[in-house]
Design a protein with these regions (language model features):
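Conserved beta-strand scaffold positions in the cores of enzyme catalytic domains, especially
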Residues: 28, 59, 97, 422-424
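N-terminal phosphate/diphosphate-binding loop that engages ATP/GTP or pyrophosphate donors
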Residues: 47-124, 169
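Switch/connector loops and helix/strand junctions flanking conserved nucleotide-binding motifs
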Residues: 66-71, 105-109, 167-171, 272-273, ...
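C-terminal lobe/tail of nucleotide-utilizing enzymes
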Residues: 1-22, 218-234, 244-262, 268-459
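Conserved catalytic network of the ASCE P-loop NTPase/AAA+ motor domain
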Residues: 22-23, 50-52, 88-91, 150-154, ...
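Short beta-strand "acidic-cap" motif of Rossmann-like dinucleotide-binding folds
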Residues: 57-61, 160, 292
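Extreme N-terminal, non-catalytic leader segments
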Residues: 1-37, 44-58, 62-83, 245-248, ...
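Phosphate/Mg2+-binding loops and adjacent switch elements
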Residues: 117-264, 268, 274-277
Length: 459
C-alpha cells in the first residue's frame, strides 16, 4: 500500500495515548509546546477521553485563553474546578476543568498559612497586591502551588495541565530555583534583617548600619514603596520557608514516574524547532517525556497521484482549452463534425484514471473506454468541465506539496530525536468548539497510524 502523510514509519516508536491515560500510575500529564499548535485542544481532548474511559480528571489551564471553557460548554473557568456536563460517565469517570487565577491562588496560600491578623495585613499591603497581580515569575510559581494542591487532593486521579504558549511554558520548572534565589538574595536579606533582629537592636541596625542603603533604595523606589516592601517582607517572613518547601516538592513530583510530559507541535519548521527545544530541556531537567503529539497533519485520499502528474495533467487541459478557444474563433457555430479537443482531452484523462468525471475523485482507477456519452461532450460544458478538472488537479498538486513538506519536516525531527515516541493527529475540517469535536480529536490521538496503514484523513 502507499502511505499518505498522516502515517509514520513502522520502525518509529509509537506514542500509545490510550495506554498512557489508562495507566492508573499516570497521575499528571503536562502538555507543552509553542503557541497556535492546538495544545489547549489537545489537553481538553485528553481530559474528555480519559474521563470517558473511567478516570477522574481535572484539566488545569495556565493559558489565559478561554477556548478550553468554550469547548467544554462551560461559560467561564476560574480558580475552582468546574464539572463538565455531557461527558459519558458510564465507565465511572468524570471531568472537571479550571483556569489558574494567579492572584486568587496567592491569596489562598496567605489565608491558609497565616493567622487572621497577619493574613489581613499581607492582603491589604500595596506591594503584595502588585506582586500577586502580575509580578514576573509569579504566575509560574502559582502554577506550581496549584498543581501541588490538586495532586494532594484525592478527588482526582489524573491531572492534565495545559501550559502557556512558547518557551515560557516550561518557566514553571524554574520557579523553585528562582524563588530560592529571590529569598536568598541580598535585597530580601536587607529588608528582613530588622524584623529578624527585632526591637531597639533592629532599629539601631536599620538606622546605623543600613541608613545609606535605605536612602538609596528610597530614591530608587520611593519612600512609601520601600515601607510597603519592608512591611510585606516582615509579614511574610515565616511563610517564605513554606513557599520554597512546597515548590521543591512539586518540582520533585514533576520528575516522578507518575508524571508524563507531552510535547505538542504542528508539522511546521518553527513549531518542531520549539518542540526540539522542549525535548532537550525536559531531558536536561530529568522530566519524564511521554512523547510528541504532531497535531493538524494533512492527508489525501488520492496520494497515488503525485503533484508532478497532477500539474502535468492540469497544464495539458489548460493548453488544450486554449487551442480549442482559438479553433472555435474560426469555426462556424453550427459545425459539429468533430468533438472539440478539450472534450477528447477530458475523456482521455478519465480513461487513464487521472480524472473521474462521475465520482469526482482523482487517483488510480481501472482503465476502460470512454463513457458512452463521450460523443455528447460537444456541448459548451466540455470547456467548463476541463476548466474545473484543471483547477481540481492544481489544488491536488498544492495539497501533495504541503504533504511532502510536512513529511520532510517531521522526518527531520524524528531523525534528530529517534527515541521520542510520536503520534500524529489528522487535521479536522474545522475548529473544535464542543465535546463532539474533542472526542473526534481524542479518537485521532489514539489512532496512531503507521506506514502500513492506508487511510483517507480528509473529512
Amino acid at each position: 500500500m502507499t502511505a499518505d502523510n498522516t502515517t509514520l514509519d513502522a520502525s518509529a516508536p509509537r506514542l500509545e495515548v490510550d495506554a498512557l491515560i489508562d495507566d492508573p500510575h499516570t497521575r499528571i500529564v503536562v502538555c507543552c509546546g509553542s503557541g497556535g499548535v492546538g495544545k489547549t485542544t489537545t489537553a481538553a481532548a485528553l481530559g474528555v477521553r480519559a474521563a470517558e474511559r473511567g478516570r477522574r480528571v481535572v484539566v488545569l489551564t495556565i493559558d489565559p485563553a478561554r477556548r478550553l471553557a468554550q469547548s467544554m460548554g462551560i461559560s467561564e473557568l476560574d480558580n475552582v474546578p468546574r464539572q463538565v456536563k455531557g461527558v459519558d460517565e458510564s465507565a465511572g469517570g468524570e471531568l472537571h476543568a479550571m483556569m489558574l487565577d494567579m492572584k486568587r491562588t496567592f491569596d489562598e496560600i496567605v489565608e491558609g498559612h497565616a493567622d487572621a491578623d497577619r493574613a489581613r495585613a499581607i492582603l491589604e499591603n500595596p506591594f503584595y497586591q502588585s506582586l500577586s497581580a502580575g509580578f514576573a515569575g509569579t504566575q509560574e510559581y502559582m502554577a506550581m502551588e496549584k498543581l501541588g494542591q490538586l495532586r494532594a487532593n484525592d478527588e482526582w486521579d489524573l491531572i492534565v495541565v495545559d501550559t502557556p504558549p512558547s518557551r515560557s511554558a516550561l518557566d514553571f520548572l524554574d520557579a523553585p530555583k528562582r524563588l530560592g534565589s529571590f529569598l536568598d538574595g541580598k535585597f530580601i536579606r536587607v529588608l528582613m534583617a530588622p524584623a529578624k533582629v527585632g526591637g531597639r537592636a533592629g532599629m539601631k541596625f536599620l538606622n546605623v548600619g543600613m541608613s545609606m542603603m535605605t536612602g538609596t533604595l528610597s530614591k530608587l523606589m520611593g519612600g512609601q514603596l520601600l515601607r510597603d516592601v519592608q512591611t510585606f517582607v516582615a509579614a511574610m517572613d515565616t511563610m517564605f520557608g513554606g513557599f520554597r518547601t512546597r515548590a521543591d516538592a512539586t518540582y520533585r513530583l514533576l520528575q516522578a514516574p507518575g508524571t508524563a510530559f507531552l510535547v505538542v507541535a504542528a508539522p511546521e519548521r518553527d513549531a518542531l524547532r520549539e518542540a526540539a527545544y522542549f525535548v532537550e530541556r525536559l531531558a536536561a531537567e530529568q522530566m519524564p517525556l511521554a512523547g510528541l503529539v504532531l497535531n493538524r497533519v494533512h492527508g489525501s485520499g488520492a496520494s497515488q497521484l503525485s503533484a508532478e502528474r497532477a500539474l502535468a495533467a492540469a497544464e495539458a487541459l489548460t493548453d488544450q482549452r486554449a487551442e480549442d478557444t482559438d479553433a472555435d474563433a474560426g469555426t462556424d457555430a453550427g459545425d459539429d463534425t468533430d468533438p472539440p479537443s478539450t472534450a477528447r482531452a477530458v475523456n482521455n484523462l478519465e480513461t487513464v484514471g487521472i480524472v473521474d468525471l462521475g465520482g469526482g475523485k482523482a487517483g488510480s482507477r481501472t482503465a476502460g473506454g470512454p463513457s458512452p456519452a463521450a460523443a455528447e461532450h460537444v456541448t459548451p460544458t466540455s470547456a467548463s468541465a476541463a476548466q474545473l478538472a484543471a483547477g481540481l488537479l492544481q489544488l491536488h498538486a498544492e495539497r501533495m506539496q504541503v504533504l511532502a513538506r510536512e513529511r520532510r519536516t517531521r522526518d527531520r525531527f524524528t531523525a534528530l530525536h529517534p527515541e521520542v515516541p510520536v503520534t500524529q493527529v489528522a487535521a479536522l475540517p474545522g475548529d473544535v468548539h464542543d465535546l463532539a469535536g474533542l472526542r473526534a480529536i481524542g479518537d485521532r490521538l489514539a489512532l496512531n497510524l503507521t506506514d502500513t496503514d492506508d487511510t483517507d484523513t480528509d473529512d
